[in-house]
Amino acid sequence: MRIVAVVAALAIAGCVLPGCAPLITESPGEGLSPVNAISDGPDKHLMLFGHDVVSYFTDHHHQLGSTAIKSVYKGVTFRFATAEHKAMFDAAPEKYIPQFGGFCANGIAYAIPWGGDADTWEIFDGKLYIFGGKGSHDAFMLDVPRNLKLAHHYWDTEVNGSNAFFQRAKRLIFRVPHYKTGKELADEVARAKK
């Protein structure tokens, strides 16, 4: 009987513990948390899959950074395409860090920190916002002032400093009052494009 319990516990741990990686990766615990980060070799909290956050501002597109050119800020690693971009970031990191930890801005408007897609982005008022894809971007663009207000509200009151995994779980169960399904948002976007 005891052997069965040990085997069952090991089986459960084997299934559950691999799912803990995002809990650690997205929560570096040094001031930027949660963040849209992955673990890549020695870089345990790599922002935006290694994309150069400065290039959005200087080159007006995203590009991957080099593993050889990087900075660590508040426990999060940022890679850069050029040494010049690294120097610009090091001089003013808060200017270049994506809003909402690099999570999808549209998701944050619903208090849900979904991963952001580095190639879907906007700069509003000198700040970088990442989106989860074209659909999320288009839905957010339907009412930018309202969605920015909602996203900043939920980031400040619920998401910032929380564990992204638990926050997602909470808000997938307990929806915000203005919640809309993906289909409802897609329908609104389609109507707006007519």
Task: List the model feature ranges, each with a label.
Residues M1-V7:
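Bacterial N-terminal signal peptides that target proteins for export
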Residues V7-P18:
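Bacterial N-terminal signal peptides
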Residues C20-K74, E94-K194:
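Intrinsically disordered, low-complexity terminal tails and linkers in eukaryotic proteins, enriched
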Residues Y73-T82:
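Short, well-structured hydrophobic secondary-structure segments
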Residues A83-M88:
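Extracytoplasmic
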